[in-house]
């Protein structure tokens, strides 16, 4: 009999988030859902952002199989200039993929 491998696997409800057209004088916030679609405990490690203008946090750092949590993120466009901007939020985890990327976009005007 084969022994089934137990692995954690992370799924993001969105891999691209577009704030649309925004102004530079507000902070924009939203969240997506992270789900452990594997069959072992998922451990979320460091959450990295590309610059000080972007922040991200999770409600939980350990997810049982089929369990979900929110990834909250914010973008402060002040001082970023006008036009199309793109920031990355990198989520590290104990999975085969090692990390997952949420791309955050906006047009500042």
Could you describe each region identified by the protein language model?
Residues 81-108:
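Terminal connector regions
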Residues 24-31, 78-88:
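Short, solvent-exposed loop/turn segments enriched in Ser/Thr/Gly
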Residues 39-68:
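Surface-exposed binding patches on compact interaction domains or structured appendages
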Residues 2-37, 105-109:
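Beta-sheet-dominated interaction scaffolds and their linkers
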Residues 17, 67-73:
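Short strand-edge motifs at loop-to-beta-strand transitions and within beta-strands
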Residues 33-36, 49, 75-77, 91, ...:
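Hydrophobic beta-strand positions in extracellular immunoglobulin-like domains
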Residues 30-32, 45, 71-73, 87, ...:
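Hydrophobic residues positioned within well-ordered beta-strands of beta-sheet architectures
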Residues 37-40, 79, 95:
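Short, acidic/polar linear motifs in exposed loop/turn regions
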